[in-house]
Amino acid sequence: MTIPSSAPQQQGPARGVQWAKRLLGVCAAGCVVAVLAACGSSSPKTPSTSSGSAATSSSAAAPASLSQLKTMVLQPADLPSGWKGAPYQPNPNDSATNAAMVKCVGGRNSDGDKVAEAHSDDFALGDASISSSATSYRSQSDLESDVAMLHSPKLSPCFEQMMKKQLAASLPAGGTVKSASVKITPGSAGGPANVVATGTGTIKVQVNGQQIPVYLTVAFITGPLIQAEVDTENVGTPLPASVVNPLVATVAARAVKG
C-alpha cells in the first residue's frame, strides 16, 4: 500500500484513523514478511521439538507446487460473514526490508531455496485486516533453521527496530511513532502442533494530534517443506482470538497435509 509523502488536507480524529489504517498495510506487507524472510535466512541448528510431526513428515515430501499452496491459504469461505477480500499486492520494498532484517539478526539468505509462494486475498472488515501466505522450500534443513531462528533473542528487538524505522519514513508530515513493541513467542500457544511460534505487536502513532494504537498478530506454521503464516492487523483493539484462532487452525490443518 502506498503512503503519501505529504500531510492530508482533511484533519481531525477520523483522518488520523485513516492514516493508521494505511500504516497497517506498511507493516503487514513489510515488517511481518521480513520476519519470515529472516527466519528463512538463519544459520541452521537443532530445531525445537515444537515443530512436531510436520518436520518429521517433510523428510520424504516433495516441495508443494504453487497450485497446491494456493489451496492452503485462507479462502473467502473461511472468513466470518462481512469480511471482504481484495487481491494481494506485493510490496516493492520486500527485498530491502528482508536484507535489513537478515543483517540485524545475522545469518544467510536462503531465498534461493524457495520453490513457490502463494498469498491469500487481503480480507478487511472496518479497521481490521487478515491475510495469509504459504511458501514451499527445497529441503528440510530450511525448515529446521527457520524454526531455530524463531528462538533467537535477537528476533523481537530487530523486528521492533526495523518496524520503527519503516513506519517513521511512511508517516505524513507531523506524524510520529510514539512506541512500537513486538514479541515473538516459540510454541503453539495452545493451538495446532504445527504452529511453531506466534507474534504480537503494538504500534502507537500520533497523526493529526491523535494518538492511535495499531495491533498486529502473526502465527508461524509449518508443514512438509512448507512455511505458512496468518497475519492480522487492527486499529484501536486487537482482533479477538475467537476470530483469529479458527483461521490459524484452518491454515495449519491444510499445511500439515502438504
Each PLM stretch: what is its role?
Residues 1-37:
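Sec-dependent bacterial lipoprotein signal peptides
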Residues 35, 39-53:
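Bacterial lipoprotein signal-peptidase II cleavage site
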Residues 48-126, 248-258:
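Extracytoplasmic low-complexity, Pro/Thr/Ser/Ala/Gly-rich segments
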Residues 63-65, 130-138, 234-239:
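Second-shell loop/turn segments in exported
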Residues 85-211, 218:
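A small/polar (G/S/T-enriched), proline-flanked helix-loop surface module common
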Residues 208-235:
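Short, well-structured beta-strand
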Residues 229-258:
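Surface-exposed amphipathic alpha-helical segments
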